[in-house]
């Protein structure tokens, strides 16, 4: 009798724990963030292809897409382009691009996008081909049509303020319901590289609203993870299904942040003696590299510290290559040879350990994330069916 009683107590304890875990997983907000970095977007594209493949395998569904699993997908610069590709609907209201289509997109269009304009007074590239291909691929689709919440950053040089394009903010700011191709060009219009982008939308009163935008990296300095988390928090607070989530409650966030690679630990370091001889132009190029590397590091440091403080370190995964060398460090080298190298970087990165203190590889960590994303999606689907 005592044995039976003990068994029943243990059974109900396990049942209660399982129910609690399922409830927490069901209410978890899932976030994908993709850095900027020009042609180096090939690196996170490789990671996205692997993750989407894992989701298709876990759910036994070849039509599974990343937008089906993430509440918020955010990106800046080339990361904004990737965000649009995997969230913009086609005629069947499914993402117009699968993750496996992204790398071929770079190979086909990258050499034309980064085709030197020959101008000595304007930007290095005229941006005409980039805008043309974005118009062809994204059509007349606007922000409100995105298949999940998006967070794509840009910076308005006329108002001197960041501009964040999200679905959830359209009720308050309908002028932000811009065409996706305008948004994508704007977030990629890096100073020095591409011309700023001007376009108009309309306010709720029908008045013209002007945008004068440049690269989202000016606003988020390359890593939009904090921006994406902020949008996810606001989204959660406005959705009754997530009413239990408090502001920036990272215990109920699942964040995957994808970098485009840095060289901060290896190549292109400088001495004070070298820098003392630089002119303004040399400083401009170096500062951009330094700022991007430093910002990426500090954003990762802050987020990982907060997740650890909340005992939720397994809810955050930063996938980043810190050992880029040679041509792979350049955001505009779209030669076939360099793009092949970037593919190799991404594929090799999957086999590397997440940290020096953990034997878990990025590949294993992404498989773990895929299982969590799949389980959470199934829990929500089951609840919705009742």
UniProtKB/Swiss-Prot annotation:
Catalytic site positions: 77, 215
GO cellular component: vacuole
UniProtKB keywords: Coiled coil, Glycoprotein, Hydrolase, Lipid degradation, Lipid metabolism, Plant defense, Signal, Storage protein, Vacuole
Sequence similarity: Belongs to the patatin family.
Protein name: Patatin group M-2
Additional detail: Patatin have a dual role as a somatic storage protein and as an enzyme involved in host resistance.
UniProt KW Cell cycle keyword: no
Highest taxon above the source species: Eukaryota
GO biological process: defense response; lipid catabolic process
């Amino acid at each position: 009798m005592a044995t039976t009683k003990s068994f029943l107590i243990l059974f109900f304890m396990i049942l209660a724990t399982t129910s609690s875990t399922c409830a927490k997983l069901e209410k978890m907000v899932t976030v994908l963030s993709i850095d900027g970095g020009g042609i180096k977007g090939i690196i996170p594209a490789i990671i996205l292809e692997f993750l989407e493949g894992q989701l298709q395998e876990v759910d036994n569904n070849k039509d599974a897409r990343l937008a089906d699993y993430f509440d918020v997908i955010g990106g800046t610069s080339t990361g904004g382009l990737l965000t649009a590709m995997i969230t913009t609907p086609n005629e069947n209201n499914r993402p117009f691009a699968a993750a496996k289509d992204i790398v071929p997109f770079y190979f086909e269009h990258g050499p034309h996008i980064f085709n030197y304009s020959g101008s000595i007074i304007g930007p290095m590239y005229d941006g005409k081909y980039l805008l043309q291909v974005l118009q062809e691929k994204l059509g007349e689709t606007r922000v409100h049509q995105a298949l999940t919440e998006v967070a794509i950053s840009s910076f308005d040089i006329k108002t001197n303020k960041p501009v964040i394009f999200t679905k959830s903010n359209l009720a308050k700011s309908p002028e932000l319901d811009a065409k996706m191709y305008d948004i994508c060009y704007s977030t990629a219009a890096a100073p020095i590289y591409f011309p700023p982008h001007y376009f108009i939308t309309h306010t709720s009163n029908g008045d013209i609203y002007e945008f004068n935008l440049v690269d989202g990296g000016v606003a988020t300095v390359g890593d939009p993870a904090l921006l994406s988390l902020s949008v996810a928090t606001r989204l959660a607070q406005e959705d009754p299904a997530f009413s239990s989530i408090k502001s920036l409650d990272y215990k109920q966030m699942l964040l995957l942040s994808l970098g485009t690679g840095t060289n901060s630990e290896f190549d292109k370091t400088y001495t004070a003696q070298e820098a003392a001889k630089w002119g303004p132009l040399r400083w401009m190029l170096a500062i951009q590299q330094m700022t991007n590397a430093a910002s990426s590091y500090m954003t990762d440091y802050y987020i990982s510290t907060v997740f650890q403080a909340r005992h939720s370190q397994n809810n955050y995964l930063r996938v980043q290559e810190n050992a880029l060398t040679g041509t792979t460090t350049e955001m505009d080298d779209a030669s076939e040879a360099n793009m092949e190298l970037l593919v190799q970087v991404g594929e090799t990165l999957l086999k590397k350990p997440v940290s020096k203190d953990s034997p878990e590889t990025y590949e294993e960590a992404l498989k773990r994330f895929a299982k969590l994303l799949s389980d959470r999606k199934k829990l929500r689907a089951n609840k919705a069916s009742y």
